[in-house]
Swiss-Prot record:
Functions by promoting the formation of the first peptide bond. This is Translation initiation factor 5A. The lineage of its organism: Archaea, Thermoproteota, Thermoprotei, Sulfolobales, Sulfolobaceae. Keywords: Cytoplasm, Hypusine, Initiation factor, Protein biosynthesis. It comes from Saccharolobus islandicus (strain M.14.25 / Kamchatka #1). One of its GO terms (molecular function) is ribosome binding.
Length: 131
C-alpha cells in the first residue's frame, strides 16, 4: 500500500487523504481554536475517489493522517467487455482489466485503440481521462 503521512493542519482543498481506509479528495477544511487548555481542531470534508461517498474527519491539527501516493499512467484500450475494459499500459506493456467509468462523459469516449489516463491508488485503478 503506497501511502505517506502528514498532519491534519497541512491538508488543503484539492489534496488527498485516507479516511476509513479509502482514498478521498478534500473538498472543505475548517479549523477551530478551542478553549484555554485545548488544542485547535480541524474538520475535513472529503469525497471518496472510488465510491464517491462524502466522508468527514474531525481531529486535532497536529494529528498524523495517511495521504495516498497517486501514480498516474497512460494506457490504450484493447477491448470493451461490457462492465470492464481491457487496457494495455503504454510504458510497461502490461495488460489488465479495469472497471468501466460510470460518468457519461468518460463512458461515451470509450472505444478500442483510444488512449486513456488512469490513476493507481493504494493498489486500485481508476480511469480519469479518455483522450
Amino acid at each position: 500500500m503506497s501511502i505517506t503521512y502528514t498532519t491534519v493542519g497541512e491538508l488543503k482543498v484539492g489534496s488527498y487523504v485516507v479516511i476509513d481506509g479509502e482514498p478521498c479528495r478534500v473538498v472543505e477544511v475548517t479549523k477551530a481554536k478551542t478553549g484555554k487548555h485545548g488544542s485547535a481542531k480541524a474538520n475535513v470534508v472529503a469525497i471518496g475517489v472510488f465510491s464517491g461517498a462524502k466522508k468527514t474527519l474531525m481531529a486535532p491539527v497536529d494529528q498524523q493522517v495517511e495521504v495516498p501516493i497517486i501514480e498516474k499512467h497512460i494506457g490504450q484500450i484493447i477491448a470493451d467487455m461490457g462492465d470492464k475494459i481491457q487496457v494495455m499500459d503504454l510504458e510497461t506493456y502490461e495488460t489488465f482489466e479495469i472497471e468501466k467509468p460510470t460518468e457519461d462523459e468518460l463512458a461515451s469516449k470509450i472505444r478500442p485503440n483510444a488512449e486513456l489516463e488512469y490513476w493507481e491508488i493504494m493498489g486500485r485503478r481508476k480511469i480519469v481521462r479518455v483522450k
